[in-house]
Amino acid sequence: MKQLTILGSTGSIGCSTLDVVRHNPEHFRVVALVAGKNVTRMVEQCLEFSPRYAVMDDEASAKLLKTMLQQQGSRTEVLSGQQAACDMAALEEVDQVMAAIVGAAGLLPTLAAIRAGKTILLANKESLVTCGRLFMDAVKQSKAQLLPVDSEHNAIFQSLPQPIQHNLGYADLEQNGVVSILLTGSGGPFRETPLRDLATMTPDQACRHPNWSMGRKISVDSATMMNKGLEYIEARWLFNASASQMEVLIHPQSVIHSMVRYQDGSVLAQLGEPDMRTPIAHTMAWPNRVNSGVKPLDFCKLSALTFAAPDYERYPCLKLAMEAFEQGQAATTALNAANEITVAAFLAQQIRFTDIAALNLSVLEKMDMREPQCVDDVLSVDANASEVARKEVMRLAS
């Protein structure tokens, strides 16, 4: 039985992870749950899964959780703060850590799990976008096993040979017969919109994703294809891929989640319903398989599958991300931070849709691109880029 810590248990990935546990109580036991401020959901999770520990981000939330659990007769020990989250990620009895805390808050707990040599089910995008080199160096030193949860990276992982899976981030693709990795994306809701009309697109229009249901921030990232740009950065680190070994493809139906092209002409793809429980269950059970609760893909109901190359005039954010990777971790960190500010400004109707890419570029041009040497350096770049982005938004919005 695998012992599990879930970082970010009350978020959507955390809830889906617990659903997989629910379907497979004989395979998984929850040791620790870590969350932000959602006490109500954490109470429900603690009562159902009886973890030894529950950690809330702040003391007030932890106090409330403790009171509510005691009233219900729960014996779960309640803790608070980032150090407690890091401790849960490194617990001796834990085999697997689901790293699903969103944003910079997830960096140190994920790094703690890596340094403790755990199997890390990686769902925190920022880990590799901002700390790719730092994290991959730590993986090598501690011999931790990274398993990607993101549907595209998980699809690539499943389509790669075992020697690469067991030495993720360091195995040589070419030596293992791999020519390239094909990263697919839907192209978002504005795939067919005339370029001249993009400036007038509203937040509500940007948030109507055709295939996946997701939050407003990531919906906008899908519309700009910044999400694919960030996934490109992650894939370069995860699979030790050069620029020439990466292809980005628009695949509007989102049925093929990504592919791998081999030297002999074969292309291996992973298909499935667009449901995050599939990649989550895959990483949890790897190298075995368990029931995820996802309905089987019905091939008879599929429409034609189509593919196209991305147009960088339509998706300048994608190009920005690809170029930022070549500049280093300071650039990818700054781009990610700037994008959070510009997307929030677009959602608040302070700037136009087309201003997102323009402002992201403007921030990159103003930043000091010295390579960060530790997580604190990364957080400093993140904070500086956010500040520059806020000023750029104010300049444009005034």
UniProtKB/Swiss-Prot annotation:
Cofactor: Mg(2+); Mn(2+)
Molecular function terms from GO: 1-deoxy-D-xylulose-5-phosphate reductoisomerase activity; manganese ion binding; NADPH binding
Biological pathway: Isoprenoid biosynthesis; isopentenyl diphosphate biosynthesis via DXP pathway; isopentenyl diphosphate from 1-deoxy-D-xylulose 5-phosphate: step 1/6
Assigned EC number: 1.1.1.267
One BP annotation, GO: isopentenyl diphosphate biosynthetic process, methylerythritol 4-phosphate pathway involved in terpenoid biosynthetic process
Positions bound to NADPH: T10, G11, S12, I13, G36, K37, N38, N124, E126, G215
UniProtKB keywords: Isoprene biosynthesis, Manganese, Metal-binding, NADP, Oxidoreductase
One Pfam family linked to the record: DXPR_C
Disulfide bonds: none
Residues at which 1-deoxy-D-xylulose 5-phosphate binds: K125, S151, E152, S186, H209, S222, N227, K228, E231
Family of the protein in this entry: Belongs to the DXR family.
Purpose of the protein: Catalyzes the NADPH-dependent rearrangement and reduction of 1-deoxy-D-xylulose-5-phosphate (DXP) to 2-C-methyl-D-erythritol 4-phosphate (MEP).
Protein name per the record: 1-deoxy-D-xylulose 5-phosphate reductoisomerase
Lineage of the organism: Bacteria, Pseudomonadati, Pseudomonadota, Gammaproteobacteria, Enterobacterales
The encoding gene: dxr
